[in-house]
Amino acid sequence: MQNRQITIAELPTDALTPANFAMIETDMPTPGDGEVLLRVILMSIDAANRSWMKGATYRAAVQAGDAMPTYAICEVMQSNSPRLSAGDIVAAEATWSDYITAAAHKVQKLPKVETLSHLMSVYGIAGKTAYHGLMSIGNPVAGETVLVSAAAGSVGGYVGQIARALGCRVVGIAGGPEKCKWVVDELGFDACIDYREAGLSKKLAAACPTGVDVYFDNVGGKILESSLNFMN
């Protein structure tokens, strides 16, 4: 049985195209002692993947010929560890492949849920980042104003919804009128500022008349600098 993988055929110098990737077939991997054979069910394809190709993040740069790394939800097909059994659902650092092997102590056993995609989204990296960042660092209190940049993104969207559930006034920052409308209408933010329009500081002052108690930053740069001016 062969294992399909998507590898980096050529590192990009500009926008990604199909020519940057190649589909190959390799022998099925065999788990060693303390390892598990995993079938990749769902994988997360994120904007950060592009940064990995440039080495502009915390992880080593992806090289030409490498299978593209990813975060994935997988099923244990074979286990050589007492930690896990065949049929378990786990989260793992994986690659764009049908099957991978991994050390059992480096994967996380997950509860079985009706909708597996929830394990990738709200219970995955984005949801955990939003929850722990807001609750462990921000410590919002009902009635406070929470400002969130990249509010239409996965982390920002979760942050805003959690803050609203806690009784906070939530103001988002996003790019473009359609995103801002979606953030307010669908995610329930109290307001959303379009950073592409002129007058960001004036818009922040209008949307946050009592100042900002918690700012959840997802972008840095000028948006961060402008937002810090309104912190209580």
Per-region residue spans from a language model:
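Phosphate-coordination loops involved in phosphoryl transfer and adenosine-cofactor binding
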Residues: 2, 142-144, 212
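Short glycine/threonine/proline-enriched tight-turn/helix- or strand-capping micro-motif at secondary-structure
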Residues: 16-27, 56
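Terminal peptide-recognition signature
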Residues: 5, 40, 130, 163, ...
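Alpha-helical segments flanking ligand/cofactor-binding loops in enzyme cores
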Residues: 38, 85, 160-161, 181, ...
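Glycine-rich cofactor phosphate-binding loops and adjacent beta1-alpha1 units
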Residues: 181, 186-187, 191-232
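Mid-domain Rossmann-like dinucleotide-binding core that forms the NAD(H)/NADP(H) cofactor-binding site
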Residues: 124-198
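Glycine-rich beta-strand-centered segment in the early N-terminal region that forms part
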Residues: 27-45, 53-96
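NAD(P)H dinucleotide-binding glycine-rich loop of Rossmann-like/cofactor-binding domains
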Residues: 68-75, 86-150
